[in-house]
Amino acid sequence: MDAGYSYASFVFVGIRYCLARPHKLTIARLQRCETTDMPLAKSSLPTSSPPRRATIGVDVGTGSARAGVFDATGRLIASAKHAITTWHSPGNIVEQSSDQIWQAVCISVRDAVAQSGLAAKDIIGIGFDATCSLVAVTAEGAPVAVGPTGDPQRNIIVWMDHRATIEAAEINAGNHAVLAYVGGKISPEMQTPKLLWLKKNLAQSLTDAGHFFDLSDYLTWRSTGSASRSICTVTCKWTYLAHENRWDSAYFNAIGLEALVADGFARIGKDIVAPGTALGDGLTANAAAELGLLPGTAVGAALIDAHAGGVGTLGVSIADAPADETRRLAYIFGTSACAMASSTAPVFVKGVWGPYYAAMLPGLWLTEGGQSAAGAAIDHLIAMHPAAAKAGEFATAAGMSVVNWLEKRAAEHSPVPTDVVDLAKSVHVVPEFLGNRSPHADPDARAVIAGLSLDTGIDDLVGLYIAGLCGVGYGLRQLLNSLRADGIQIDTIIVSGGAAQSDLVRQLLADATAIPVAAAATPEPVLLGAAMLAANAAGLFPSLQQAMVHMSGTAVVFHPMQDRTAALHTARFQAFEALQTVARQIR
């Protein structure tokens, strides 16, 4: 894919993201698909051979910070990651440290660049994405405690933290106008309920904090000293009204956060910019030294990690399918699951976040659903089973993760991927261990497992694993039905994320939702999206859209089976919804 195109000599370092391209490349299609070769459109970039240049993107997920190096065609050259610590406390409290995360970012960037064989002078830009976690620091950048331990190093309220469930309910009771843009109900995972919790429980911390950041905005601030926030973060998680370019003062005053209004919202963001915008004067001398880069290296305004995955996947080339991002759903299947649809006009879907203007793709409205626990729910299901320890031993002996070993075992029992659902037998799972994010917007919902027997063997664990995956797929199917009912039509699901790396999972999602599932050829679409932010900030491409056009690749497509398999999944989906209803009635 590199040879013969002038932009092949450009290199990008990134951590998660991408979008649409008009030309088509070779696409390998599995099962009932064909392989079609189509010519790659010639680049409009200069034909001379420029010096080697690279951009870096960084992604901070729930458990690690990662960095990757890409060339201008989107090919991954090198990547690295470093683990981060998460603290769990009673009361659904989950916290992290911004200092530790920054250290992990620096290690990952240094390692990725070293593996790429590039020098600091070759790096012209860096982009960031991260989980939508809340960071509290003083005006000078010192961490501020956000939890009952009083430890200032624990200064991040992690995205999955549900301490503010009561505060979210109080806000929702007010029927505020801004709630129309979060599906009618604000989630305890969003930032204003968490800030209200701080006011009630740690008032001094609310006073001491000179800045409250979404994590990805914190990373760009620490890199550049610029306090500009991304449209993505403040619109999706802080109730900023991007379509009106304003905060709603009446909302903040009404819910008790008038202190943030008093200084003109300076502590949560006065300057709001589009993702990929070049910030400040680039890397400060201190940040550059820590990252192993040069001062002044361009830094792009950030994205939330899931949205980076959306940008990094929606533009893939699919044979015989137009690159229409309004007909594609980006589904990022990781610890949680995020499902993002774009539209040319605002579409209000009850229980689904948004519509958010320009929060992911410029000029388009974003509607965002998903589940708080997806990959985490699968991990929890496995850990609950009596055979989990034995499966772990087998997996270790085979040099595999437990999940990969279970997939291998399932494939041995069911060589045809579409028949793997039979292994679930009578077991049904509603995997809502951390509530229902959408379309019911019910943080109090809990998981349901039905159809268990006294079997404690390995193959029973395999069946539970498959049933759990089906449950994740049926939750997505339910969301798609809600979107469809309000006028958002989806033809293809574009999947990414650590929990969606296997063909078995992708085929099962296609069968469970009855919609084709496509997977980008790049192994790291979220990292790729962040690399695109860097490319835009550095001026390597004239816009983020053009970076997406040139860096998106091909897709592998998994088509849903018909007849018996389709009927079985329809019946199981009906059981899924029935169990959901009963669970609400009896709690």
Locate each region found by the language model:
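Gly/Ser/Thr-rich active-site cleft segment
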Residues: 60-62, 128, 140, 178-306, ...
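Glycine/Thr-rich phosphate-binding loops that ligate phosphate moieties of nucleotide
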Residues: 32-81, 88, 124, 128-169, ...
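Phosphate/pyrophosphate-binding loops at sites that engage ATP/ADP/AMP, CoA/4′-phosphopantetheine
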Residues: 107-124, 202-206, 251-265, 479-491
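Short hydrophobic alpha-helical segments enriched in small aliphatic residues
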Residues: 3, 8-13, 24
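N-terminal phosphate-binding loop and adjacent alpha-helix
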Residues: 80-120, 158-159
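Stable alpha-helical structural segments in soluble proteins, enriched in small hydrophobic residues
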Residues: 104, 108-116, 219, 310-313, ...
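Conserved phosphate-binding catalytic cores of ATP/NTP-utilizing and phosphoryl-transfer enzymes
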Residues: 39-51, 284-293, 303-326
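Acidic, glycine-rich loop-and-beta core segments that form the ion-binding/anion-interacting portion
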Residues: 302, 308-309, 313, 317-342, ...
